[in-house]
UniProtKB/Swiss-Prot annotation:
Pfam families: Histone. Belongs to the histone H2B family. This is Probable histone H2B 3. Its main location: nucleus. Core component of nucleosome. Nucleosomes wrap and compact DNA into chromatin, limiting DNA accessibility to the cellular machineries which require DNA as a template. Histones thereby play a central role in transcription regulation, DNA repair, DNA replication and chromosomal stability. DNA accessibility is regulated via a complex set of post-translational modifications of histones, also called histone code, and nucleosome remodeling. GO terms for molecular function: DNA binding; protein heterodimerization activity; protein-containing complex binding; structural constituent of chromatin. Monoubiquitination of Lys-118 gives a specific tag for epigenetic transcriptional activation and is also prerequisite for histone H3 'Lys-4' and 'Lys-79' methylation. The keyword Lyase does not apply. It comes from Caenorhabditis elegans. Keywords: Chromosome, DNA-binding, Glycoprotein, Isopeptide bond, Nucleosome core, Nucleus, Ubl conjugation. It comes from the Eukaryota. The nucleosome is a histone octamer containing two molecules each of H2A, H2B, H3 and H4 assembled in one H3-H4 heterotetramer and two H2A-H2B heterodimers. The octamer wraps approximately 147 bp of DNA. The gene is his-41. It is found in: Nucleus; Chromosome.
Amino acid sequence: MAPPKPSAKGAKKAAKTVSKPKDGKKRKHARKESYSVYIYRVLKQVHPDTGVSSKAMSIMNSFVNDVFERIASEASRLAHYNKRSTISSREIQTAVRLILPGELAKHAVSEGTKAVTKYTSSK
């Protein structure tokens, strides 16, 4: 006799069995890194009573990754042009000035400078 079919409402997904490797140890899940914790912290600083959906968080995470990649590649290009093997805060600052438009670049540079100063003074 076939088992009864679960109703559509409240149906649970079948539990996935973890296939054991030959040495008998369970495989660990690969950690998925994201900026969601930090995005959430900033949101709570700016708007304490506002929440964020998982879809919106995913979009914000993609945005942060995209901006990070653009700045990193531009800074890398600048270091290569100047025959440097190390990306310093100067390359990052120049990359930010090149990538971000007008007033946004000015604010980003001042916040970045403030963060670097705070970091170096705490050492």
